[in-house]
Each structure stands twice: as structure tokens, then as C-alpha cells.
């Protein structure tokens, strides 16, 4: 049986990184600072891509490595794929 893994890099992150390919409907266990939770995946997730581990409102930061890496362009539910279709940059043009 294949063991599929995810990683929460920093306790303040709101996304996990997938270390395997996952299918929608699979359940992943996550250790948070508030306790262990199980997350049902709402989308197929490719290796190396991000999974929302907390609900993220539109306009809210996407946090990975304990740092903001972008902002949600729409509401993102727990278990959803987090990628360019629902994340924008957080940089202002000069």
C-alpha cells in the first residue's frame, strides 16, 4: 500500500504541500498546532501542489513557509487545490 504524504511547513501556514498525487475524495491527516484534523480533498492534487488546510476568504493571504506567497482571488475551501486559478500575486507595481 502506497503511503501518501503532505507537509505543513510552518504552523501558521494555511496550505499543505502534496508529496504525492492525490484524487478528489481522498482523506489526508494533518497535524496542526490546534490538534490533528482530517481533510477531505475536493480536487485532484498533483505532486508539489498546495492544498488548503484552512478556509481562506477572497483577498486573504496564502501563507506557506510562514510567509505570504500570494492572496486568494476567490474563497478557497478546506481541501481545495490552491494554485494560479485561485491565487494572485500580492505585489504592487511601481
Give the role of each language-model region.
Residues 2-94:
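N-terminal small-residue-enriched
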Amino acid at each position: 500500500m502506497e503511503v501518501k504524504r503532505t507537509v505543513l511547513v510552518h504552523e501558521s501556514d494555511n496550505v499543505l504541500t502534496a508529496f504525492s498525487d492525490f484524487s478528489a475524495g481522498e482523506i489526508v491527516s494533518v497535524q496542526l498546532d490546534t490538534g490533528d484534523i482530517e481533510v477531505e480533498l475536493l480536487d485532484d492534487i498533483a505532486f508539489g501542489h498546495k492544498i488548503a488546510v484552512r478556509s481562506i476568504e477572497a483577498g486573504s493571504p496564502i501563507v506557506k513557509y510562514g510567509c505570504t506567497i500570494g492572496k486568494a482571488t476567490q474563497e478557497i475551501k478546506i481541501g481545495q487545490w490552491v494554485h494560479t486559478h485561485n491565487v494572485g500575486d500580492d505585489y504592487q507595481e511601481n
